[in-house]
Amino acid sequence: MCTSSKSLLDLIKYPILTEKTSRLIEQNQYSFAVDRKADKISIKSAVEALFDVQVVAVNTANQPLKKRRVGKFIGKKSRVKRAVVTLAPENSITFFENA
């Protein structure tokens, strides 16, 4: 598990809003960028505590490191861990309602 000193806001960085995640919202699945060291259990407890919902499942994926070029310099885009959180049918997160 992730260290207990991290707060809930440190685990969940920001919501991910794309066309695909907009379709997933209709299926009651919400996507977040999370701390790379966070595990599924801590992500579940953080979402339940922050949004007062019941989480059914958590799926995670580590995105690969991507190289980006700016002029003649080659840099690296930071890696992100995505979490797709499935909620119980009677729950929803109002933060995503306007998306």
UniProtKB/Swiss-Prot annotation:
Keywords: Chloroplast, Plastid, Ribonucleoprotein, Ribosomal protein, RNA-binding, rRNA-binding. Disulfide bonds: none annotated. It is found in: Plastid, Chloroplast. One of its GO terms (biological process) is translation. Pfam families: Ribosomal_L23. One of its GO terms (molecular function) is rRNA binding. Its main location: plastid. The keyword Ribosomal protein applies. Binds to 23S rRNA. Part of the 50S ribosomal subunit. Belongs to the universal ribosomal protein uL23 family. This is Large ribosomal subunit protein uL23c. It comes from Emiliania huxleyi (Coccolithophore). The gene is rpl23.
